[in-house]
Amino acid sequence: MEPNSLRTKVPAFLSDLGKATLRGIRKCPRCGTYNGTRGLSCKNKTCGTIFRYGARKQPSVEAVKIITGSDLQVYSVRQRDRGPDYRCFVELGVSETTIQTVDGTIITQLSSGRCYVPSCLKAATQGVVENQCQHIKLAVNCQAEATPLTLKSSVLNAMQASPETKQTIWQLATEPTGPLVQRITKNILVVKCKASQKHSLGYLHTSFVQKVSGKSLPERRFFCSCQTLKSHKSNASKDETAQRCIHFFACICAFASDETLAQEFSDFLNFDSSGLKEIIVPQLGCHSESTVSACESTASKSKKRRKDEVSGAQMNSSLLPQDAVSSNLRKSGLKKPVVASSLKRQACGQLLDEAQVTLSFQDWLASVTERIHQTMHYQFDGKPEPLVFHIPQSFFDALQQRISIGSAKKRLPNSTTAFVRKDALPLGTFSKYTWHITNILQVKQILDTPEMPLEITRSFIQNRDGTYELFKCPKVEVESIAETYGRIEKQPVLRPLELKTFLKVGNTSPDQKEPTPFIIEWIPDILPQSKIGELRIKFEYGHHRNGHVAEYQDQRPPLDQPLELAPLTTITFP
């Protein structure tokens, strides 16, 4: 009777389902408990068998911490009520509050935050919102960090933009306030900018979006928060695209500096009709490295091989050949002469072959750059004596070729004077050619070598006796900006007092009327038979103290201080 009673309890609409199956469930191989096929582990708590491991949860991009290179905590937070591509900035900090008690004054530190969304900012100033807004809460719980992008000076120099744009990008990139470009999401980036009323933190958001539809051509859009309700489209007119903002060029330069990013954003890099000109790199024949005859064949082969690789990856052939050429030159042509290795293999009593002792132009130019570094010392004033070098005519021809890079013709000197030397040797009539360089990027391009890049700023620390010593801090080079700022953020360096010297070239202050030149003087045939000339380099440098321009103060200890000796005592012998 019991089976019949159970059958009568089944509803009529379930009577024709047929025999039950095990679809969607499975037995646990350990305890035999039935579990769903999508389960990760056995639901029997005493068993605990794990069937498969779930996918690792990706970090949320609701809030991303920006690398600032300082104690300033800035976050890029998504505005949920506007869409995935709308983001704002949130600043977190610690504020001190004093409380007066009977025992005295107590100073407490409270964590505070400031949201830069206009509505939240207005509500906070009016005192309408008592608690923290949703954007500050997201920033407090943030665990993701932005990815800094590399910016190579070689790509910046090769980019066909105005000199003012290049110099502004270079100044922003070399400031110790974090990397110039940081990647927040797949399409959104954060770019440094000059602090203003609209962008008081000195950062803004940009986005590169590509929309693909089957009916029309792919549409590429660039948005920048420095412009109001405007976007740059790939099919826009030339008048609109001619007004590219400086942040667009900064992002394009960062994309071109990395091979993976260049391939990802190749549509923006290769598109020429939208107003973005191709990044033309100077040919090797016009570059100063071509003066080294031993490098020509190796560099040309490596350049051809690099072009084949780039074309196979469907990238713009004019985008990154300079990187390949320069890297191959570093590996092959621009090595030190083989003299050093051959000398190590020589026996102690073996004579040195004088024909193998040579000095290349690259090695000599590296010594000039090192001499400039030594001269930019914080302990001395910013107007040093001219640096004098006696070099062959061929070396100066190579240097003049570097001075003329970027122009179709050889750059003529700013002034040519003839003078008669009577009070010093050698006597006679000589000609002096003078070049005035007023662009810091061009000075760096002239003096940069793979072994000794020109340092525009130098850091120092002050000793107890008032002297100054060079401070070897983590590198802030633009070439390795991603690695540098990542290391600084993880292991901050203690800097009690920031003392720096900087090379004065161009307009270095807002009220400066005439640009400060970097002067190169050349007097040929000082030694006419040997074809040796005299090269003079004149420059000025300034002093920075905690980020502000400081006047030079001579704090060196006087050299004529009398030595304090212990009084002599009489020693008697028995």
Swiss-Prot record:
Signal peptide: none annotated. InterPro entries: C2orf42 (IPR026049), Zf-tcix (IPR029269). GO terms for cellular component: nucleoplasm; nucleus. Disulfide bonds: none annotated. This is Uncharacterized protein C2orf42. The gene is C2orf42.
